[in-house]
Amino acid sequence: MRRTQMNLTNETFSKALDDNKVLIVDFWADWCGPCLKVAPILDEIANEYNVTFAKVHVDEEQDLAYKYDVSTIPTLLVFENGLPVKRVVGAQPKHKLVKEFEGWI
């Protein structure tokens, strides 16, 4: 099991995709209540499964949010081999997120 939580910027995003076969990216903001609610759940999943999570603060990295069509937060994007393959929008309980991520965790 590995637990990695990276804060990504426009400058570090591509390298993170290149360095991880599967990367789950949490697009969030510190003023977003549902984002704060889901954060500890993502920490639990990262600790229990073989998955790397990263965070993108949408206020600070608006270009990335725009590029990946993130208009609602939290939005979780699963990237596989550098490509977005799954989108989960909104805070969800742990068991639902685990089910959404099946095949990647």
Where do the language-model regions lie?
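Short active-site neighborhood of thiol/selenol oxidoreductases, capturing the structured segment around
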Residues: 18-30
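N-terminal "domain-start" segment that seeds a small globular fold
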Residues: 1-18
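Structural signature of beta-strand start/N-cap positions in the alpha/beta core
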Residues: 23, 50-52, 81
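N-terminal targeting signals for export/organelle localization
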Residues: 1-3, 44, 98-99
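Hydrophobic heptad-repeat coiled-coil signature
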Residues: 32-35
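Structural signal for short hydrophobic segments within the conserved structured cores
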Residues: 4-6, 54, 85-88
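Non-catalytic, surface beta->alpha helical segment in thiol-disulfide oxidoreductase systems
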Residues: 80-105
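Thiol-based oxidoreductase modules, predominantly thioredoxin-like and allied folds used
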Residues: 8, 27, 39-63, 70
